[in-house]
Swiss-Prot record:
Compartments, record wording: Nucleus
Coiled-coil intervals, chain numbering: 201-246
Function: Putative transcription factor.
Predominant subcellular localization, coarse grouping: nucleus
Lineage of source species: Eukaryota, Viridiplantae, Streptophyta, Embryophyta, Tracheophyta
Xref: InterPro entries: RKD-like (IPR044607), RWP-RK_dom (IPR003035)
GO cellular component: nucleus
One Pfam family linked to the record: RWP-RK
Organism encoding this protein: Arabidopsis thaliana
Protein name: Protein RKD3
Keywords: Coiled coil, DNA-binding, Nucleus, Transcription, Transcription regulation
GO molecular function (one): DNA binding
Length: 277
């Protein structure tokens, strides 16, 4: 025991009191006791002697007997299966090395998460359903608009001035509807063809004047010569044809006066009818 004193002094000098209190190395009291007359005084002198290996066996056997409980615990487990499949985590969970997941769980994708979050919530399901319907409606509307624009562009590009003449006697909105195009595109095509304004009002006014003169021509009793009325009718018919060819043409002075005279005649006729009744 006198040989163990330097060892105890060295351990105390290095502050190993906590380990000595636990008495973990108590098994070294017997295993390191060596006879001074034996060959262990110089172990490196005969490194492969029986005494050296017997000393190793005694230390290892003593350690194995001391920690027998640990070996028993490890032996009860299938180490090969654990190393190949699972490893124990610090937080008492299992990590699967094959699929790289914790506790052998399969992580859901984003679609499954979104469906799981919306399950049981009728408001969220209704909102998602409305959003999908809105997206479909917008997509269908865009397709309809693109098809209509493509068709309208084809119709407008093929439209000439001669084709538009037959639509001059109707309002521009009705003409666009008849042509199955938009009013804006029709106005644009008119400007491209040199028609700054739609001549519907001018032609309608001329048709009204012609109708009034025909009535006067049938009801005259010698106060107005019929020859003058016929000349006026010819003048209006000529001007109507000129406006069809040149829609931007303004009325002449004779046409303006004739229009004022017709207005006065209609006014007098109304006064007579109202007074007689």
């Amino acid at each position: 025991m006198a040989d163990q004193r330097p060892l105890m002094t060295w351990l105390e000098a290095n502050n190993y009191e906590s380990f000595l209190q636990e008495d973990i190395f108590s098994f070294l009291d017997q295993s390191l006791f060596v006879d001074p007359h034996s060959s262990f005084i110089d172990p490196f002198k005969d490194f492969q002697t029986q005494n050296w290996f017997s000393l190793q066996d005694s230390i290892v056997n003593h350690i194995s007997t001391t920690f027998a409980a640990d070996h028993t615990f490890l032996a009860s487990l299938d180490l090969e299966a654990i190393s190949s499949t699972f490893s124990l985590d610090i937080s008492s969970g299992w990590w699967n090395e094959n699929n790289g997941n914790y506790n052998n769980q399969v992580e859901p994708n984003l679609d499954e998460i979104s469906r799981t979050n919306t399950m049981g919530d009728p408001n969220m399901e209704q909102i998602l359903h409305e959003d999908v319907n809105t997206m479909k409606e917008k997509t269908s509307q865009k397709r309809i608009i693109m098809k209509r624009r493509y068709r309208e562009d084809g119709v407008i590009n093929n439209m000439s001035r001669e084709m538009m003449k037959q639509y001059f006697y109707m309002p521009i909105t009705k003409a666009a509807k008849e042509l199955n195009i938009g009013v804006t595109l029709l106005k644009k095509r008119c400007r491209e063809l040199g028609i700054p304004r739609w001549p519907h009002r001018k032609l309608t006014s001329l048709n009204a004047l012609i109708a009034n003169l025909k009535d006067l021509l049938g009801n005259t009793k010698g106060r107005t010569p019929k020859s003058k009325l016929r000349n006026a009718l010819e003048l209006l018919e000529m001007e109507k044809k000129m406006i069809e060819e040149v829609p931007d043409l303004e009325f002449g002075d004779k046409t303006k006066r004739l229009r004022q005279a017709c207005f006065k005649a209609k006014y007098k006729r109304r006064r007579l009818f109202s007074s007689s009744s």
